[in-house]
Amino acid sequence: MNRSLLAFAIVLVLLVAGTSSQLFNKSGNCPMRNTVTSCTPRCIGDGECSSNQKCCPNKCGTTSCANSSPLNTGSDGGYKGSSNQQAVYCNGVKCAAYEKCQYDRNTRRDKCTRV
């Protein structure tokens, strides 16, 4: 009985440790999506990235580890607009309040488009 309880406790601790590392949120801001050109390694949370990196949206439409930015580009790194009232930047251009940053497949560039 004691061995099974000990085994259960160990599994529970490992599960909690693994989950908390994925949910751990590091300080700093994600850079703008179009500046994160590395699409690998993919990540789910900041805990998967090395010491000074965050898990951020990238140019490929997924998330990968990137160096944090001193600028606040919104909670999503300027990715496809932001639900809050913060400005969204697209290719270094500030989008209007009714626009979002979206990848244009024809020009292969990000551009501001209406929401």
From Swiss-Prot:
Look up the coiled coil feature and give its residue ranges: none
Q: Which residues form the signal peptide?
A: 1-21
Q: Supply the Pfam families for this chain.
A: WAP (PF00095)
Instruction: Please name the GO terms that the record assigns under molecular function.
Output: serine-type endopeptidase inhibitor activity
SMART domains, alphabetically?
WAP
Top-rank taxon, per record? Eukaryota
- SUPFAM superfamilies the UniProt entry points to: Elafin-like (SSF57256)
Where, subcellularly, is it found? Secreted
Which GO annotations describe the biological process of this protein? defense response to bacterium; defense response to fungus; killing of cells of another organism
Its cellular-component GO annotations read: extracellular region
Q: Where is the WAP domain?
A: 23-69
The record ties this protein, via InterPro entries, to: Elafin-like_sf (IPR036645), WAP_dom (IPR008197)
- For this chain, the annotated S-S bridges are 30-56, 39-60, 43-55, 49-65
Give a brief account of the tissues where this protein occurs: Expressed by the venom gland.
Record keywords, A-Z: Antibiotic, Antimicrobial, Disulfide bond, Fungicide, Protease inhibitor, Secreted, Serine protease inhibitor, Signal
Q: What does this protein do?
A: Antimicrobial peptides with activity against Gram-positive and Gram-negative bacteria as well as fungi. Recognizes carbohydrates in the microbial cell walls, and induces structural damage to them. Also inhibits microbial serine proteases, as well as mammalian elastases. Carbohydrates that are recognized are LPS, mannan, peptidoglycan, and N-acetl-D-glucosamine.
Q: Which family does it belong to?
A: Belongs to the venom waprin family. Cys-rich waprin subfamily.
From the Swiss-Prot or TrEMBL record, give the protein name. Answer: Waprin-like protein
